């Protein structure tokens, strides 16, 4: 499975592509950070991100995109810009019929380091080890994009099993409700014929 990991942001947007192998084997194919100047109009910044993502999607043809879920209890403007960048990326994926999955920062940290409260240095160190990179990916947005892709590769089988189980439970619920409805209707008809 080829996964594009995205650490969305207006000033720096981390992009990565990794390929999963057997078990937990993952191979880094590419990583970069798209930068947009803070002083430029929002629409132009989003367009620059969109153009870069379009190029990456056309070049790397990922099977799925993993985007960091926006979370911020500090700066609403930062959270809004991050969400807007993530939306541009999700839209580009939807136009190509590529699945998009969102992962929280704590899910990513837990998947990569075993600790959902790991700091950026710990995440970067583990990403470097997991992917057997010669040097640490910089800036942190690049490491975060790789961590998102790794997280998705490792969580995807579980997510697939959970989705299948939820679908099976929903189907059983529908059948059970149909049976109850049929029994109620039969009981009502039986009473009306007496």
Curated annotation (Swiss-Prot):
Signal peptide: none annotated. Mg(2+) 1 binds at residues 7, 141. It catalyses: Endonucleolytic cleavage at a junction such as a reciprocal single-stranded crossover between two homologous DNA duplexes (Holliday junction). The active site is at 7, 68, 141. Binds 2 Mg(2+) ion per subunit. The keyword Cytoplasm applies. GO terms for biological process: DNA recombination; DNA repair. Keywords: Cytoplasm, DNA damage, DNA recombination, DNA repair, DNA-binding, Endonuclease, Hydrolase, Magnesium, Metal-binding, Nuclease. GO terms for molecular function: crossover junction DNA endonuclease activity; DNA binding; magnesium ion binding. InterPro entries: RNaseH-like_sf, RNaseH_sf, X-over_junc_endoDNase_Mg_BS, X-over_junc_endoDNase_RuvC. It comes from the Bacteria. PANTHER family: CROSSOVER JUNCTION ENDODEOXYRIBONUCLEASE RUVC (PTHR30194:SF3). The RuvA-RuvB-RuvC complex processes Holliday junction (HJ) DNA during genetic recombination and DNA repair. Endonuclease that resolves HJ intermediates. Cleaves cruciform DNA by making single-stranded nicks across the HJ at symmetrical positions within the homologous arms, yielding a 5'-phosphate and a 3'-hydroxyl group; requires a central core of homology in the junction. The consensus cleavage sequence is 5'-(A/T)TT(C/G)-3'. Cleavage occurs on the 3'-side of the TT dinucleotide at the point of strand exchange. Belongs to the RuvC family. HAMAP family: RuvC (MF_00034). This is Crossover junction endodeoxyribonuclease RuvC. It comes from Mycolicibacterium vanbaalenii (strain DSM 7251 / JCM 13017 / BCRC 16820 / KCTC 9966 / NRRL B-24157 / PYR-1).
